[in-house]
């Protein structure tokens, strides 16, 4: 079986690492695996190739801003990708995140449809079934056509062309041989969202959870010394992972509020440090951490990991934390509560800080078998489990008539 994965990036950022992990896992299992990617440094590896240029991507970013159509244009890069597809001649093309000013998604879907190539489309975000936005939040306009988009300004669109973009995306998906297309989602919640679009619900939609690096993310046996090295005592420790602090969309203001309410609890924040006017003494900013062993140590020495995002389709911190034997509390954000281990997690309505504080206090008061938690999580979130899930989808497509 010959598989071609297509993604924005390779072996960097979340989806790039997922694609690289799958590529290595497939190769180890004797599957003929290829990757085509668009952005980032050129990678010199067998069967891995880049199809776009950084300058061209920036040009198309301007085009997207001027037209309000995010996933069109990209004529040259898309034609180069078609050439790679013809040369590889895959049994299955697996599309991941292809929304970074790099490929004309409408052309690509129509090309695969016309050529009768078996196709797997993985939704890592919502833009394929909404037509434009990665997170629709409370908006349901995408159910029947979009337009008058409440996020047009935040997406930096000069014109609100979301209705046209929605029609183009739905037309690209319409007419696929149902035995040749399978949509996968990274969480059960995202599947529920996708099935609300009638253009998607006619196809097979299968959740396949993201896999993480369980070789590094596992429970570490800690001592008081581990905490003392980063200035912590024996007080309860709450872990919070973010790309940047402060970051309103990631809910960092909720962390500030909880820290004020719970001065007896230490909050460990991993993420790039920004400018903060006032920081409670019990918030410890450790900056961005790239080393996975060190990340696993921080998860393991914490008593609980907290999630305060408004929307997440999966949430790597939830999976990583549980693999390290640390329970999770947070706001309901869609994906996290649908992929978690319920026994060790508690989620409350978004923005309800009182309930979040109660949930946090409750989890801190519980005694968990953290070794058992870690073993269950590793079994659920391993790269092997992810690869098994996708291979089952591939086999189903190969067997379909």
Give names to the regions the model predicted.
Residues 184, 232-250, 256-259:
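Conserved donor-binding/catalytic core segment of Leloir-type glycosyltransferases
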Residues 195, 212-229, 277-280, 399:
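Acidic anion/phosphate-binding donor-loop and adjacent secondary structure
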Residues 271-296:
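Nucleotide-activated donor-binding/catalytic signature segment of Leloir-type glycosyltransferases, i.e.
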Residues 297-302:
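Short alpha-helical donor nucleotide-sugar binding micro-motif in glycosyltransferases
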Residues 310:
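Aromatic "clamp/platform" in nucleotide-sugar-dependent glycosyltransferases that forms part
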Residues 327-330:
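Short hydrophobic beta-strand element within catalytic cores of glycosyltransferases
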Residues 342-353, 362-367:
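Conserved acidic donor-binding segment of nucleotide-sugar-dependent glycosyltransferases
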Residues 367-398:
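A charged, aromatic-enriched C-terminal amphipathic alpha-helix characteristic of glycosyltransferases
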């Amino acid at each position: 079986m010959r598989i071609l994965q297509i993604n924005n990036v390779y072996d960097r950022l979340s989806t790039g690492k997922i694609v690289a992990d799958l590529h290595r896992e497939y190769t180890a299992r004797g599957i003929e695996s290829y990757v085509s990617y668009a952005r980032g440094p050129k990678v010199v590896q067998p069967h891995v190739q880049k199809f776009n240029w950084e300058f061209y991507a920036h040009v198309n970013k301007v085009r997207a801003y001027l037209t309000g159509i995010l996933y069109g244009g990209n004529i040259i890069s898309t034609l180069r990708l078609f050439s790679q597809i013809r040369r590889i001649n895959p049994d299955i093309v697996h599309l991941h995140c292809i929304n970074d000013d790099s490929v004309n998604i409408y052309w690509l879907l129509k090309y695969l449809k016309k050529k009768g190539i078996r196709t797997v489309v993985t939704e890592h975000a919502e833009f394929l079934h909404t037509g434009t936005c990665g997170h629709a939040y409370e908006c349901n306009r995408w159910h029947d056509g979009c337009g008058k988009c409440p996020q047009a300004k935040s997406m930096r669109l000069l014109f609100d062309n979301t209705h046209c973009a929605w029609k183009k995306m739905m037309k690209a998906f319409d007419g696929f041989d149902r035995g040749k297309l399978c949509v996968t989602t990274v969480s059960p919640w995202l599947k529920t969202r996708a099935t609300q679009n009638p253009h998607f619900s006619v196809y097979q939609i299968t959740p396949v959870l993201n896999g993480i690096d369980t070789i590094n993310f596992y429970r570490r046996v800690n001592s008081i010394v581990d905490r003392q090295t980063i200035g912590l005592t024996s007080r309860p420790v709450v872990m919070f992972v973010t790309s940047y602090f402060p970051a309103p969309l990631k809910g960092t203001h909720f962390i500030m509020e909880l820290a004020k309410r719970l001065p007896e609890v230490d909050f460990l924040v991993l993420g790039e440090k920004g400018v903060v006017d006032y920081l409670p003494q019990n918030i410890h900013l450790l900056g961005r951490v790239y080393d996975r062993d060190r990340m696993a140590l921080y998860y393991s020495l914490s008593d609980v990991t907290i999630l305060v995002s408004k929307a997440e389709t999966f949430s790597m911190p939830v999976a990583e934390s549980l693999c390290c034997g640390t329970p999770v509390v947070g706001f309901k954000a869609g994906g996290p509560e649908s992929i978690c281990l319920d026994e060790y997690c508690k989620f409350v309505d978004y923005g309800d800080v009182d309930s979040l504080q109660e949930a946090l206090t409750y989890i801190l008061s519980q005694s968990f078998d953290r070794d058992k938690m870690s073993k269950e999580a590793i079994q659920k979130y391993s790269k092997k489990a992810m690869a098994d899930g996708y291979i089952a989808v591939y086999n189903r497509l190969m067997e379909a008539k």
